Amino acid sequence: MENINKIPVVINGAGGKMGREVVKAVAGAADMEIIAAVDKNPALLGQDAGEIAGCGAVEVPIVNDLEASLVMATQSKIQGVMVDFTHPSGVYANTRAAIAYGVRPVVGTTGLSEEQINDLKEFAEKASTGALIIPNFSIGVVLLQQASLQAAKYFDHVEIIELHHNQKADAPSGTAIKTAQMLAELGKQFNPAEVEEKEEMPGAKGAVTEDNIRIHSVRLPGLIAHQEMIFGAPGQIYTLRHDTSDRSCYMPGVLLSIRKVTELNTLVYGLENIL
């Protein structure tokens, strides 16, 4: 039975690797309650979300009906939150649906375009509904990005290498794109050409942003999530790197985001903006 003093949480993508971690984290949070767990995997339907996650029964079966779950979240005295870890192909529609129902989305799924993010921000503002899009929930990644901003003031050459498991659908990663955007806000042009460049194979030197920052994506089994920032100057190389060894590292950021989104009335992009 729903506790009126707890934040009601809908977990979309509850059967995935990140979704299962979210189930465990929310189930263990004293101020939150899982009211719905959604997943499209037919093999999981009807099973207890907690049992699937490995944290014991939470008495919430996995369903494949996001709309009904959002309706359930609107019936609480405390405004509900939807956490989305699904797929790039569906995240825009999921997020827009949550806002339309007055349920505050916390989006960890990457792959949203800049145009889609701007549209969702406008939609959230019109609805006066808080929303969070977080490319990476790790506090360590926020520190990597902040250190990169400091380094970029003194280095004109930088490349980003992001490495993920081979089941990640989008490339570059949302974290790499966000990091490049943060560097671009410094207002400088990176990687001035020293020679006339020629790629024998298109894309050999990585994807290039408008500010001439190169991003390289690696997808291999055995990886989880990693990002390396390589800064270069005559006579020196400065390297920053963050490695994720377990998805549990994201959960403090997820729980913080669930709590913070209830205080917002617009869309915020990036964990660093709510810390």
Swiss-Prot record:
Full protein name: 4-hydroxy-tetrahydrodipicolinate reductase
Catalytic residues as annotated in Swiss-Prot or TrEMBL: 164, 168
CDD domains per UniProt: DHDPR_N
Binding site for NAD(+): 13-18, 108-110
Gene Ontology biological process terms, A to Z: diaminopimelate biosynthetic process; lysine biosynthetic process via diaminopimelate
Family listed: Belongs to the DapB family.
Binding site for (S)-2,3,4,5-tetrahydrodipicolinate: 165, 174-175
Function: Catalyzes the conversion of 4-hydroxy-tetrahydrodipicolinate (HTPA) to tetrahydrodipicolinate.
Annotated GO CC locations: cytosol
Source domain of life: Bacteria
NCBIfam families listed in its UniProt record: dapB (TIGR00036)
EC number: 1.17.1.8
Keywords: Amino-acid biosynthesis, Cytoplasm, Diaminopimelate biosynthesis, Lysine biosynthesis, NAD, NADP, Oxidoreductase
Keyword Cytoplasm included in the entry's annotation: yes
Pathway: Amino-acid biosynthesis; L-lysine biosynthesis via DAP pathway; (S)-tetrahydrodipicolinate from L-aspartate: step 4/4
UniProt-recorded Gene Ontology molecular function terms: 4-hydroxy-tetrahydrodipicolinate reductase; NAD binding; NADP binding; oxidoreductase activity, acting on CH or CH2 groups, NAD or NADP as acceptor
InterPro entries linked: DapB_C, DapB_N, DapB_N_CS, DHDPR_bac, NAD(P)-bd_dom_sf
HAMAP family: DapB
Pfam families in alphabetical order: DapB_C (PF05173), DapB_N (PF01113)
Matches recorded under PROSITE patterns: DAPB
Entry's localization field: Cytoplasm
Record field: catalytic activity: (S)-2,3,4,5-tetrahydrodipicolinate + NAD(+) + H2O = (2S,4S)-4-hydroxy-2,3,4,5-tetrahydrodipicolinate + NADH + H(+); (S)-2,3,4,5-tetrahydrodipicolinate + NADP(+) + H2O = (2S,4S)-4-hydroxy-2,3,4,5-tetrahydrodipicolinate + NADPH + H(+)
